[in-house]
Design a protein with these regions (language model features):
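Basic, often amphipathic N-terminal segments
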Residues: 1-72, 95-155, 171-182
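Short, flexible loop segments at boundaries between secondary-structure elements
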Residues: 151, 157-164
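A basic- and aromatic-enriched beta-loop-alpha substructure that forms the phosphate/nucleotide-
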Residues: 80, 84
C-alpha cells in the first residue's frame, strides 16, 4: 500500500479546481474528481510504508507548523505523455515557503516512513495539482483548451493536511481545516 501526504486548499481554491474537474468530466475526460473521496491537493510526499502510530505526533506538528502557506497557481503544466496517457496539472509558483514546507514534511517523517518516491525528493519536487492524470495524447489540446478556463493566476492557501492510503483510496488522517485568511 502506498501512503501519500497531501496539502489541501482553502474553499475558494478547492472550488475552482473542482470546476475544472467537472468540465473535464462533462467531456468524458478522466480527472481525480472521478474518485468520490478525492480532494484537490498538492502532494508533499509519497511513501511505500509509514509507521502510523509513531507518525501521529509529527503529522500533528505539520498541521500546526505548516498552516496557511500561501499559493499562487500561475500556469498549466504537462508531464510528458507515455504512449497511452499524460498528466495535465495546475502549477503553483515555487516559493521559499512551499519548498520549506516540503522539506519539513520529509524531516518530520524521516524516522517513520520508508520507500520515499524519488520524484518527491528535495531538488526533484515539482509541486502540482493534477487536473487529469489519464489524458490520451490525442486529447491533450482539447484538455488544455478546457483547462484554460482555470482562473489563472489563482491565489489561495494551504488550509489542511491529510495522510491518504491508496488501493483503495481512503483518508487515514487529516488536520482540521484552518481558517483561510485571504
Amino acid at each position: 500500500m502506498v501512503h501519500v501526504i497531501e496539502a489541501f486548499f482553502d474553499p475558494a481554491t478547492d472550488a475552482a479546481i473542482r470546476a475544472v474537474w467537472r468540465a473535464l468530466g462533462a467531456r468524458g475526460i478522466a480527472s481525480p474528481g472521478d474518485e468520490p473521496s478525492a480532494r484537490p491537493h498538492l502532494t508533499l510526499g509519497v511513501y511505500g510504508a509509514i509507521d502510523l502510530v509513531n507518525a501521529a505526533a509529527p503529522l500533528a506538528a505539520l498541521a500546526t507548523e505548516g498552516a496557511l502557506v500561501p499559493l499562487t497557481f500561475a500556469s498549466l503544466g504537462l508531464f510528458p505523455p507515455s504512449a497511452r496517457e499524460a498528466v495535465v496539472f495546475a502549477a503553483p509558483i515555487v516559493t521559499a515557503e512551499l519548498l520549506a514546507l516540503h522539506r519539513r514534511v520529509r524531516e518530520l517523517l524521516a524516522a517513520h516512513a520508508s520507500d520515499s518516491a524519488p520524484y518527491y525528493a528535495p531538488g526533484q519536487f515539482v509541486p502540482h495539482c493534477t487536473l487529469t492524470q489519464r489524458c490520451p495524447p490525442a486529447r491533450i489540446a482539447e484538455v488544455l483548451g478546457i483547462c484554460r478556463t482555470f482562473p489563472l493566476p489563482l491565489t489561495g492557501q494551504i488550509a489542511a493536511y491529510g495522510l491518504i492510503a491508496t488501493a483503495p483510496l481512503r483518508e487515514l488522517w487529516h488536520s482540521t481545516t484552518h481558517r483561510a485568511e485571504r
